[in-house]
Amino acid sequence: LGGRKGGMPEMVFEYVLAQKGIDKKDVNINQSIDFGSTAAAFSGGQGDYTIEFEPSATLLEQKGDGYVVASVGTESGYVPYTSYSVKQSYLKMHGATVEKFTKALQKGMDFVQTHTPEEIAEVIAPQFAETELETITAIVRRYYEQDTWKENLIFEEESFDLLQEILEQAGELEKKAPYKTLVTTKYAEEAAAKG
């Protein structure tokens, strides 16, 4: 179960398959189920494998419905799943806000780099009130051991190129965009330097 065509989980999965020498035509990737519903479909008996974000992956394990056998993220390289985008006009008018926001995010990155999975889980637990602390800790530990979190927020050109390569390979990008035109690392670099 890959989620819908054009969704990042499915596109990154196809990219990893290609990197491992597996032609996507040799596997049956079900793209008929919305990504938010794949865990339930898998629990219900659909598919031999599923691609899941957390907490779905850990919950499948805890229910005995599946096992995490590999991390697509570990195999793909640093894919910039989350980024902050603003128009140039906003950046010009509200640069101080972007700077404060970036510094706050960097503080979170610094915290993750200097604390144990147990400490991180305790701090973030109130944001996940419906999830038990033990589950949150298991998820954080998995991400921690996989080196999921970078040390800083700098959106490197290599990651930008990787993202575009994934989109292009999936048939979702007709023309690559120039990194220097679309990305500024000024605020992230300043926040990392002050960290």
Positions of PLM-derived features:
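Residues that form or immediately flank small-molecule/cofactor binding pockets and catalytic motifs
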Residues: G6, D34, G73-T74, T184-Y187
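Residue-level detector of short coil/turn "hinge" positions at structural boundaries
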Residues: K24, Y67, E174-K175
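Conserved C-terminal helix/tail region of periplasmic/extracytoplasmic solute-binding proteins
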Residues: D161-G195
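Bilobed "Venus flytrap"/periplasmic-binding protein-like clamshell domains
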Residues: L1-Q62, E157-L162
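Secondary-structure end/capping motifs
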Residues: K92-E174
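Short hydrophobic/aromatic-rich motifs at helix boundaries and adjacent loops
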Residues: E10-M11, N28-N30, L59, P80-Y81, ...
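Residue-level detector of family-conserved "landmark" positions at structurally sensitive sites
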Residues: V27, A70-S71, T135, I154, ...
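Pocket-lining segment of extracytoplasmic ligand-binding domains
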Residues: G36-A129
